[in-house]
């Protein structure tokens, strides 16, 4: 899980999701998981 100021899709399988007011990226590749600060 990378925590970044700006999250973006890295590959085609990445999905942007809003959870509890935070923007997250979920992906089949675990290295692509991100969360906004």
Swiss-Prot record:
Spell out the Pfam families in the cross-references: Ribosomal_L36
For this entry, list what GO says about its biological process: translation
Where in the cell?
Plastid, Chloroplast
KW Ribosomal protein (keyword) present: yes
Q: Which GO CC annotations does the UniProt entry carry?
A: chloroplast; ribonucleoprotein complex; ribosome
Q: Which UniProt keywords apply?
A: Chloroplast, Plastid, Ribonucleoprotein, Ribosomal protein
What GO molecular function annotations does the UniProt record carry, in alphabetical order? structural constituent of ribosome
The record's listing under SUPFAM superfamilies reads: Ribosomal protein L36
Q: What is its main location?
A: plastid
The UniProt entry's sequence similarity note says: Belongs to the bacterial ribosomal protein bL36 family.
What's the protein here called?
Answer: Large ribosomal subunit protein bL36c
